[in-house]
Amino acid sequence: MAYPFELGFQDATSPIMEELLHFHDHTLMIVFLISSLVLYIISLMLTTKLTHTSTMDAQEVETIWTILPAIILILIALPSLRILYMMDEINDPSLTVKTMGHQWYWSYEYTDYEDLNFDSYMVPTSDLSPGELRLLEVDNRVVLPMELPIRMLISSEDVLHSWAVPSLGLKTDAIPGRLNQATLTSTRPGLYYGQCSEICGSNHSFMPIVLELVPLKHFENWSSSML
């Protein structure tokens, strides 16, 4: 769920997104402390008349401002590298879905099934039912099993697109002639919305993404009904 006025991230529904939120808070605290220190020093310089115009050498100060930034960078880099390794490709996904971007819709192919593919178009505002979201509903949702590792293969048929679902921490470019990969695992069922995040033409704002994460049994029933 999104926060009013976009004041915060969407609620995390995957382990990766939870880690990204923790990393964001960790980095933001470091930035806040550094900014506070810099502002304090600037205000001190502007409000005091004490200066050291004759200082030519200060080994202690130079040592501190060399070592301290290095420590801060390490504190930022280590958790960042940990998340990057967590986001790396998986060797044995439970399901693989191929996503192709078009002007201006998405097509999906479940590669583990012989003939399970469909196009996904935005539902026009005039056709929305009560309670449905404007510019975010589609005629065919991507139904996926929850609590299982899923590999998304993402490419494009025409121009640059970007397949993004914020609550899952996913954003992968769809590039013509190139196959990019993303991994997702949902910890709870629900509907998760995203949009194309790369300007791709006049109808860029009208190619939403809707993932429906369901228990494995419901996914098997859905896939059987689609074949």
UniProtKB/Swiss-Prot annotation:
Cofactor note: Binds a dinuclear copper A center per subunit.
The enzyme's E.C. designation: 7.1.1.9
Mitochondrial matrix face of the membrane: 46-59
Cofactors, names only: Cu cation
InterPro entries registered for this protein in UniProt: CcO_II (IPR045187), CcO_II-like_C (IPR002429), CcO_II_C (IPR034210), Copper_CuA (IPR001505), Cupredoxin (IPR008972), Cyt_c_oxidase_su2 (IPR014222), Cyt_c_oxidase_su2_TM_dom (IPR011759), Cyt_c_oxidase_su2_TM_sf (IPR036257)
PROSITE patterns in the cross-refs: COX2 (PS00078), COX2_CUA (PS50857), COX2_TM (PS50999)
One cellular-component annotation, GO: mitochondrial inner membrane
Residues annotated to bind Cu cation A2: 196, 198, 200, 204
Ranges facing Mitochondrial intermembrane side: 1-14, 88-227
Catalytic activity: 4 Fe(II)-[cytochrome c] + O2 + 8 H(+)(in) = 4 Fe(III)-[cytochrome c] + 2 H2O + 4 H(+)(out)
Subcellular location: Mitochondrion inner membrane
Stored PANTHER family: CYTOCHROME C OXIDASE SUBUNIT 2 (PTHR22888:SF9), CYTOCHROME C OXIDASE, SUBUNIT II (PTHR22888)
Record protein name field: Cytochrome c oxidase subunit 2
Taxonomic source organism: Tamias quadrimaculatus (Long-eared chipmunk)
